[in-house]
Amino acid sequence: MLNPSRFRILAIGKVRKSWIQNGLEVYRKRLPGLSITEIRDGDIKKESRAIISSIKKDELLIALCEEGEKFTSMDFSHWLQNLGSSRIVFAIGGTNGLSQEVKTSADLCISLSALTFPHEMARLILAEQLYRAISIAKGSPYHRE
């Protein structure tokens, strides 16, 4: 079964929009144990070092980038379930995205959509998709096809 404590989100920069902060708070409550860490934005090389240095040996790094693999919500849930008990860190870039170094270091690059979203919104969308993935795994009526 999927457990929110297996997931960490590393995100560059702060969320400045209150409505996004409010949305994230909703999903933090729905996903107890989900960790969201903000990394100070600035030089993309420093951001990259901060992301890569925070990954533990037993964690998988998943980079969110527009050219990444695309999933349906069902496929995303099944993919997460198939990872077993692995701890997963999702890296979300700031205004300049993620460096090639982070993308190359990642175990996988995924895309939330063919559309481009502000990095603050990407956090909220990812949190919702993690909640949806867990709901699918539990057979909850939250996800409807």
Curated annotation (Swiss-Prot):
The keyword Acyltransferase does not apply. S-adenosyl-L-methionine binds at L64, G93, L112, S113, A114, L115, T116, F117. It catalyses: pseudouridine(1915) in 23S rRNA + S-adenosyl-L-methionine = N(3)-methylpseudouridine(1915) in 23S rRNA + S-adenosyl-L-homocysteine + H(+). Keywords: Cytoplasm, Methyltransferase, rRNA processing, S-adenosyl-L-methionine, Transferase. GO terms for molecular function: rRNA (pseudouridine-N3-)-methyltransferase activity. It is found in: Cytoplasm. It is an enzyme of class 2 (transferase). GO terms for cellular component: cytoplasm. It comes from the Bacteria. Pfam families: SPOUT_MTase. Signal peptide: none annotated. Its EC number is 2.1.1.177. Its main location: cytoplasm. SUPFAM superfamilies: alpha/beta knot. Homodimer. Belongs to the RNA methyltransferase RlmH family. Specifically methylates the pseudouridine at position 1915 (m3Psi1915) in 23S rRNA. This is Ribosomal RNA large subunit methyltransferase H. It comes from Prochlorococcus marinus (strain SARG / CCMP1375 / SS120).
